[in-house]
Amino acid sequence: MPPASATKVLAIHRVPPPPPTGTTNDQAAGVGTTIVTSFRVFPALPFRARWIARITEFEWNHFFADVQEKGPFKDWHHRHDFLAQTRDGVTGTLVHDVIDYEVGFGFAGVIANSLLVRRQMEGTFAERQQRLAQLLAQQY
């Protein structure tokens, strides 16, 4: 990943997945900010789900955390950490996501998480990391 300040990474990190997978309302930053996202649960199908999250913690250039207020999960807590890191003598920013979630729906949710949800989320976050690297590379 190209070297970048936490400020630049934080600004770009708020970019949602590209349509048609997901869209996000314009976002301000700070505690209490509500983020509304529309996304396809199954990308091959036209059905969209709405996800409402609220930022509960925020420290500029260091981290922010959000919780789901309404959406596909029984429980969702997500923390985005922006950590200064030096590699090969170049200082940049490492983005680290910590996610604690519960699918719900009892045993069926456990099965769905094992077969689909976890892999889909891993793919979404891997795509976000790739997009972040691409967008930052365009800045340099």
Give the role of each language-model region.
Residues G123-R131:
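A non-catalytic, amphipathic alpha-helix used as a structural packing/dimerization or gating element
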Residues K8-E69, L135-Y140:
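Glycine-rich portal/gate segments that line the openings of hydrophobic small-molecule binding cavities
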Residues V110, Q134-L135:
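Residue-level signal for well-ordered alpha-helical scaffold segments within enzymatic catalytic domains
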